[in-house]
């Protein structure tokens, strides 16, 4: 019985050594932290500058500078324009 156990354990020794050798292999994936850091900083700068330039260029059509208009204001302007034109005397064409 002891001889059988020694034989079985002797068969397991190469398996254990092979698994230990696999653990010592260098991981082929290597993090390049410097490039990752620079890329992140560039991304942050772009995300900061694009909206800032957009707001500073005054092309943003923000509504805080405009007065609120009533829906009837446009119609009132058209009616005033029509009545103003009707009051002017028409010139005779000769």
Curated annotation (Swiss-Prot):
Source organism per UniProt: Homo sapiens
Protein name in UniProt: Putative FXYD domain-containing ion transport regulator 8
Subcellular location: Membrane
Extracellular side: 19-34
Domain of life: Eukaryota
Family of this protein: Belongs to the FXYD family.
Membrane topology, record value: Single-pass type I membrane protein
Major place of residence: membrane
Pfam families in UniProt: ATP1G1_PLM_MAT8
Biological processes per GO annotation: monoatomic ion transmembrane transport; positive regulation of sodium ion export across plasma membrane
Topology Cytoplasmic: residue spans: 59-94
Membrane-crossing segments per the record: 35-58
Region ranges (Disordered): 66-94
Gene Ontology MF annotations: sodium channel regulator activity
Keyword field: Ion channel, Ion transport, Membrane, Signal, Transmembrane, Transmembrane helix, Transport
Classification via InterPro entries: FXYD_motif, Ion-transport_regulator_FXYD
GO CC terms of this entry: membrane
Signal peptide: 1-18
């Amino acid at each position: 019985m002891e001889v059988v156990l020694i034989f079985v354990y002797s068969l397991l020794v190469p398996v254990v050594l092979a698994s230990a050798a696999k653990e010592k292999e260098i991981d082929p994936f290597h993090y390049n932290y410097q490039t990752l850091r620079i890329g992140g900083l560039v991304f942050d700068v772009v995300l900061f500058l694009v909206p800032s330039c957009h707001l500073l260029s005054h092309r943003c059509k923000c509504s805080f500078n405009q007065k609120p208009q009533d829906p009837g204001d446009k119609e009132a302007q058209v009616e005033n324009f029509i009545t103003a034109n009707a009051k002017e005397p028409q010139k005779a064409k000769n």
